[in-house]
């Protein structure tokens, strides 16, 4: 099975990590896989030297030049599957396939990792009509696609997976020393892009409530994005400069997870949340909202605590409960690690994805 994978992002987030895990997993399973991505992007920088790579990214969603270059590559390479991992990639692949004169075209698979509705404009409707199969990161995402009119037979759920070997090999970050934190101060962590739907504003508001009861608690937010100035202002307004740290983009997120005492996902919308998987694989107890597919990962009361989105008080109460109960933290952390090992490995995700490929390639 030869699959060609398209990701047009220049930055590195959970989606790009899943692309790389999928591509490398296909190769490890003995299948050919090629990556089409931004020539100057973070994904290319992190890809193995020996990986088949085509530097190509559309400047706009209707970049006919990029689509033409892709169509020529498809004609030459003749992949069985084209797996587009973002909306611009879907558009470029759909345009490229429409230019093909081959009697049998490659099957188009679209990854869907966000719990947003499909856009209703003409271009969006056209490009998604060309998709042979949607691979959804959660059942919550699949339900949204079905509500948008996608036939049930065209959408399948494949939960994301993580490389457990990388998790085991990551050293623990020395955050107390790096940020000059008080000895023994518990650390509550959040790893996500600083964008509105990740809900870090609620995380900071909850921190203000937590420190009233656990004054030595510290909060580390790893990520960058448009929300940074807003969060900086909020932290100052709430007098939390000594308690909340904006750590910026970090390539060592697994090491960070191992240094956290509690991991919090404050999203107001979320496809699945691979940061949850990373944290659970590192044995961290979770506080997460019920947004999107997160309840498919976090078992409330067993591997973590689920709270309603946008509820600062509920978020704070859950954090306080865990910070005050070490035995509960250890029990939930161990249960989360066991769950990820059993159900959310990269090998399982790759095998399920390959099964989707094989099912549509035979048609």
Language model features: what each stretch is:
Residues 13-24, 186, 190-212, 219, ...:
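A conserved mid-protein helix/loop that constitutes part of the nucleotide-sugar donor-binding site
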Residues 35-37, 285-288, 298:
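Short hydrophobic beta-strand element within catalytic cores of glycosyltransferases
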Residues 102-139:
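A conserved, positively charged/aromatic
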Residues 140, 161:
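Carbohydrate-associated surface elements
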Residues 167-181, 236, 350:
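A short helix/loop element that forms part of the nucleotide-sugar donor recognition site in Leloir-type
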Residues 249, 268:
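Aromatic "clamp/platform" in nucleotide-sugar-dependent glycosyltransferases that forms part
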Residues 300-301, 305-312, 321-327:
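Conserved acidic donor-binding segment of nucleotide-sugar-dependent glycosyltransferases
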Residues 314, 321, 328-343, 352-355:
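A short, well-ordered alpha-helix in the C-terminal region of glycosyltransferases
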């Amino acid at each position: 099975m030869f699959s060609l994978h398209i990701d047009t992002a220049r930055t590195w987030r959970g989606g790009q990590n899943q692309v790389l895990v999928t591509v490398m997993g296909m190769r490890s399973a003995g299948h050919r896989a090629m990556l089409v991505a931004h020539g100057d992007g973070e994904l290319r920088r992190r890809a193995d030297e020996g990986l088949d790579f085509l530097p190509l990214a559309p400047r706009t969603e209707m970049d006919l030049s990029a689509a033409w270059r892709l169509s020529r590559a498809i004609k030459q390479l003749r992949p069985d599957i084209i797996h587009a991992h973002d909306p611009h990639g879907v558009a470029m692949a759909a345009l490229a396939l429409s230019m093909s004169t081959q009697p049998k075209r490659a099957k188009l698979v679209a990854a869907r990792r966000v719990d947003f509705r499909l856009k209703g404009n003409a271009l969006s409707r056209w490009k998604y009509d060309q998709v042979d199969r949607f691979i959804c990161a959660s059942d919550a995402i699949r339900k949204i696609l079905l509500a948008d009119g996608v036939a049930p037979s065209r959408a399948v759920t494949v939960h994301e997976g993580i490389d457990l070997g990388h998790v085991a090999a990551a050293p623990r970050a020395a955050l107390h020393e790096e940020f000059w934190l008080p000895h023994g101060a518990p650390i509550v962590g959040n790893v996500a892009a600083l964008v509105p739907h990740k809900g870090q504003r609620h995380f900071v508001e909850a921190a203000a409530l937590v420190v009233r009861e656990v004054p030595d608690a510290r909060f580390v937010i790893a990520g960058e994005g448009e929300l940074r100035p807003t969060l900086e202002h909020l932290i100052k307004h709430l007098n939390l400069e000594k308690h909340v740290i904006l750590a910026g983009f970090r390539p060592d997120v697994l090491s960070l997870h191992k240094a956290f005492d509690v991991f919090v996902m404050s999203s107001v919308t979320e496809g699945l949340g691979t940061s949850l998987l990373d944290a659970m694989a590192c044995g961290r107890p979770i506080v997460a909202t019920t947004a999107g597919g997160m309840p498919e990962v976090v078992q409330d009361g067993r591997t973590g605590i689920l709270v309603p989105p946008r509820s600062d008080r509920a978020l704070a109460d859950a954090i306080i409960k865990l910070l005050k109960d070490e035995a509960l933290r250890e029990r939930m952390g161990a249960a989360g690690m066991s769950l990820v090992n059993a159900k959310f490995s990269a090998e399982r995700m790759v095998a399920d994805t390959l099964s989707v490929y094989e099912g549509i390639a035979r048609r």
